[in-house]
Design a protein with these regions (language model features):
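Glycine-rich nucleophile elbow surrounding the catalytic serine of serine-hydrolase chemistry
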Residues: 122-134
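The feature captures the conserved acid-bearing segment of alpha/beta-hydrolase catalytic domains
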Residues: 161-224, 230-232, 241-248
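Catalytic histidine-centered segment of alpha/beta-hydrolase-like enzymes
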Residues: 88-89, 229-239
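Cap/lid segment of the alpha/beta-hydrolase catalytic domain
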Residues: 81-100
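Active-site nucleophile loop of the alpha/beta-hydrolase fold
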Residues: 144-155
Length: 249
């Protein structure tokens, strides 16, 4: 990154994220106690749901609340939490030191499960992971909510995304040649035909910019909501009774 790139560029929007008692209470709970990997497997299940937590270790809400709201308590599922807050580029304890090691672990878990349907699901940073691993493994479909689609310094600067600066800066300080920092490029190279859903709220223009990066992929459907609660879209979908419908797709 050049010296000029370190100077934050004014954001191309004036949207504000408004916290409320309803959509922000869960943030006060300590999700740091959640393990990096939590499994709840059902023998003989045909569908395996792979969940990837965001920066605060959630899926737009606490994992169990998401499962309950989405009516998937009886499904086989594995939840992953990136304790390094590095968009899953630095691996997971006991698994390996990069995203590719996580990919190998996921492949083994999918094979062992015997599942015929696999879904990669995530919110925000977790949505980035869901798209990344779905393309990496060439299996299943991704269902994502307000995902980032790039974390490379050049594109963040050009498009005016200065969110999560401390976490992104720490990652940029140790980038390697094998890191996956631009999903448009990654999907184009690995699996341009992959199937995915991207759900995004028009109340957060930066999230919209990220979603728009994936325009042009024939099997990636971008669902834009005029309202949707901004970056808290998952909770808005839950309250609207839509979350369970989406997870059944």
């Amino acid at each position: 990154m050049t010296a000029s790139e370190k100077i934050p560029k004014p954001l191309p929007h004036d949207a504000k994220r408004v916290a409320s008692a309803n959509n922000d209470a869960w943030r006060n709970q300590d999700v740091s106690q959640l393990p990096p990997i939590s499994e709840s497997l059902v023998p003989g299940a045909e569908k395996l749901l792979l969940f990837f937590g965001g920066l605060v270790g959630s899926i737009g809400m606490l994992p169990f609340e998401f499962y309950r709201s989405a009516q998937i308590l009886d499904h086989s599922k594995i939840f992953f939490r990136d304790i390094y807050q590095s968009w899953y580029q630095r691996g997971l304890p006991g698994i390996g030191r990069d995203a590719h090691a996580i990919g190998d672990y996921l492949q083994a878990k999918i094979d062992a499960s015997g599942a015929t349907e696999v879904r990669f699901i995530g919110n925000s940073m977790g949505g980035y992971a869901a798209l990344m691993f779905c393309a990496m493994l060439g299996r299943g479909k991704a269902i994502t909510f307000v995902p980032q689609t790039f974390i490379c310094p050049q594109k963040r600067f050009r498009l005016g995304d200065d969110r999560y600066q401390d976490k992104v800066h720490a990652l940029h300080q140790s980038l390697t040649a094998t890191d996956i920092v631009d999903l448009k490029r990654w999907i184009s190279e690995r699996r341009p035909e992959m199937e995915a859903q991207v759900h995004v709220s028009g109340e957060d223009p930066i999230d919209m910019l990220h979603a728009n990066e994936l325009e042009g992929f024939g099997n990636i459907a971008i669902h834009r909501y005029a309202q949707g609660g901004g970056h808290d879209l998952v909770q808005w979908l839950r309250d609207a009774g839509e979350l369970a419908k989406i997870l059944k797709a």
